[in-house]
């Protein structure tokens, strides 16, 4: 049997090259079998791209990455035009191969020791008041990247004392306690970790992840920092039922999670998991009502909602759809 070719550091694998390395075989979608995108998912392009270009130039100048670009988020134009961005630290190559995600897979380079300072300076220059910091999975690092998160938060606050920081962290597989010890030295203002989907779909959608680990990460952080809101996000359209999603919401509340985002999965390419259905806005409204009933302090539920979409407004408890 042929072994997979050893990956070279810094080489990005995308699409077929990426998903060919997961345990569940994905048959590339043919155009005539792909579901037609409904009108409620049409995104209006901005009248001007000037602000988008300014933010992209600032990121390139400092060698930084935004998950908005790397994950092909449909809200990039809207968020960039509002002067907000979700920064992705620890490089743009992920050690996982989730077939719903458009971020590249491969062997990452060593963390950039200068990134925390460059990130803080960029945020200051962009005059941001609320930032989201996320990362790729770094299973190659002993702490999963936790120290780099803490370093970034510390440097950001040095130059931006009034800023609010939300972290969207990976699952720190096999090293939760060690990671939480480090993160506790520089806790964020909002702690976010996405469950992504219902547990029965993890094998196909989140190979290498574990539903209970993710719940435990959220709960253990909350036990250490009871005054910091915890948050999680889910996608719909991967074959789950509304009842399955409802149970995930109950599980999140049982693990003391207070904030929720729920949006529609969109297939990045024909080599990724197909969209099994487009969920109508009315069904998102029903799940929003359930989330409110269960006691979430804020639930953003709608087709175009993403974990970081208007995160500043979400943190203020304002309605986001």
From Swiss-Prot:
InterPro entries (alphabetical): Aldolase_TIM (IPR013785), Elp3/MiaA/NifB-like_rSAM (IPR006638), Lipoyl_synth (IPR003698), rSAM (IPR007197)
Residues binding [4Fe-4S] cluster 1: 68, 73, 79, 308
Top-level EC class: transferase
Reaction(s) this enzyme catalyzes, per UniProt: [[Fe-S] cluster scaffold protein carrying a second [4Fe-4S](2+) cluster] + N(6)-octanoyl-L-lysyl-[protein] + 2 oxidized [2Fe-2S]-[ferredoxin] + 2 S-adenosyl-L-methionine + 4 H(+) = [[Fe-S] cluster scaffold protein] + N(6)-[(R)-dihydrolipoyl]-L-lysyl-[protein] + 4 Fe(3+) + 2 hydrogen sulfide + 2 5'-deoxyadenosine + 2 L-methionine + 2 reduced [2Fe-2S]-[ferredoxin]
Subcellular localization(s) per the UniProt record: Cytoplasm
Cofactor, free-text remark: Binds 2 [4Fe-4S] clusters per subunit. One cluster is coordinated with 3 cysteines and an exchangeable S-adenosyl-L-methionine.
GO MF terms, alphabetically ordered: 4 iron, 4 sulfur cluster binding; lipoate synthase activity; metal ion binding
Binding site for [4Fe-4S] cluster 2: 94, 98, 101
Recorded family membership: Belongs to the radical SAM superfamily. Lipoyl synthase family.
Protein's UniProt name: Lipoyl synthase
One term under GO cellular component: cytoplasm
E.C. code: 2.8.1.8
Gene it is expressed from: lipA
Pathway it works in: Protein modification; protein lipoylation via endogenous pathway; protein N(6)-(lipoyl)lysine from octanoyl-[acyl-carrier-protein]: step 2/2
Cofactor requirements of the protein: [4Fe-4S] cluster
Stretches assigned to the Radical SAM core domain: 80-297
Annotated organism of origin: Shewanella baltica (strain OS185)
Keywords, sorted A to Z: 4Fe-4S, Cytoplasm, Iron, Iron-sulfur, Metal-binding, S-adenosyl-L-methionine, Transferase
